[in-house]
């Protein structure tokens, strides 16, 4: 869980997103940072027994800096007004499928899968789907997964209009093969993060994503 003071810090930062305010509130930030790290540690403690691939992860592998990269952005606000928790065997610097928790006043959610893979990884995932699409269908149709997440998140930006090169339009998995991103998500109210059962509640949902993550990671870690 996060304290209400931590949520208030994020709200105040959003309203005062500048370096002077941040420096004036540095002590508040340090308290917030410890709270954030504790939350990540709690997720690791809850998830590691359920997914052995996470065993070597430490808190520092799963957090994000509060500073924004504004080099190529029109929005020059220097700080993020949200936090994320990323749990993956590939850590943050490697392309793998994983579990994600996003906490923001603008919209909080949990998610899993592989977001916008690079070209070579995308080819590997599509190849895996082409050969083992029945396995993927079984994962997505599992009753608890279907109840909590339903399907991949789909929008016009992450779906090709035509079949990808090398695949026929009548391939039985063509709707999966046309995807450019393979993630699924569920929204939650940000106030839930202040409740004592937040981590345990979210862990029960996140672990439902393990078969999907395993399927994708099997593809991206293959040699061919």
Model-assigned labels for residue ranges:
Residues 2-19, 36, 43-44, 130, ...:
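Long, solvent-exposed, polar/charged low-complexity segments
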